[in-house]
A protein has these predicted regions:
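Single conserved hydrophobic/aromatic residue that forms the stacking wall/gate
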Residues: 1-15
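ATP/NTP-dependent adenylation/nucleotidyl-transfer catalytic domains that generate, transfer
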Residues: 20-39, 163-230
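ATP-dependent adenylation/pyrophosphate-handling site
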Residues: 27, 33-82, 166-172
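ATP-dependent adenylate-handling ligase core
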Residues: 59-64, 72-130, 160-162, 166-169
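Residue-level detector of anion-binding/catalytic polar loops
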Residues: 94, 137, 200
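Short, ordered loop/turn segments at secondary-structure junctions
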Residues: 100-102, 144-146, 206-207
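Short secondary-structure transition/capping segments
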Residues: 108-111, 151-154, 213-218
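Active-site adenylate/phosphate-handling loop in enzymes that bind or generate adenylated species
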Residues: 117-188
Length: 230
């Protein structure tokens, strides 16, 4: 997907998102020479936008880094990654899929009433193992500006403390650095980018999707935005 093959609108969107991403990376020194960075691809708009932004940035960024994409397949039926594989080929990014039986364990064997916590723990375990095998030293998560605000609200409402994501976090156990390059981009801008670039988004097949504390925080913030815009 070379820029000269895109429409003027698409080029503008690429340059804008790349600019925001680079500003975050430079502000918090997220990337060093020789890094091997993985992007965790869920199939959602956020992770695909991050993949695109980093793939574009890699072309001219002064610090040279390798980039791969990786998806943890939880074992849902009809989870088709064909279009994501094609996007990765177009962006010259190696793509890896980690097949698991997490869905079966969480929903059928354990029958978890609150499945998100166990699922996240198992998913991260499978992801970190693969990253270790591939000798990646950094993982880029697609948390955007709205995610940071929602996490702050969730910690306040449900934990009684003030907390949100850090721009980068070192994980001692897995010897990995987590970076969050989309922190300056809001969700509306990501939606526009996804639509303009026709990114191959996969709808989440998870039966618990839409019933999380994060979704509650998202809706609460949307109501606040209606009442007091800006």
């Amino acid at each position: 997907r070379d820029l000269h093959l895109l429409s003027r609108r698409q080029r503008q969107m690429c340059i804008r998102d790349r600019s925001y991403t680079r500003r975050a990376i430079d502000s918090y020194e997220m990337i060093d020479n020789g890094d091997k960075i993985a992007v965790g691809i869920s199939g959602g708009k956020d992770s695909l936008t991050l993949l695109y932004a980093l793939a574009e940035l890699r072309r001219f960024y002064p610090k040279k880094f390798d980039l791969i994409a990786i998806t943890v397949n939880l074992g849902f039926d009809n989870f088709d990654t064909t279009k994501i594989e094609q996007l990765c080929k177009e962006l010259y990014v190696p793509y890896y899929i980690v097949d698991t039986e997490i869905y079966d364990i969480v929903f059928n064997i354990r029958k978890e009433k609150n499945p998100c916590s166990l699922c996240a723990k198992m998913r991260k375990g499978a992801l970190n193992q693969k990253l270790n095998d591939l000798r990646c030293n950094k993982i880029a998560y697609a948390h955007h500006k709205d995610d940071f605000i929602e996490t702050f609200l969730m910690s306040l409402l449900f934990e009684g403390r003030i907390h949100t994501f850090s721009p980068k976090t070192y994980l001692d156990k897995s010897k990995l650095m987590v970076i969050r390059p989309l922190m300056y981009i809001n969700e509306g801008e990501i939606i526009s980018f996804k639509n303009d670039m026709q990114l191959p988004v996969i709808k989440s097949p998870c039966p618990a999707d839409g019933y999380t504390k994060r979704e509650y925080a998202k809706q609460a913030l949307a109501e606040l935005e209606k009442e007091t815009p800006g």
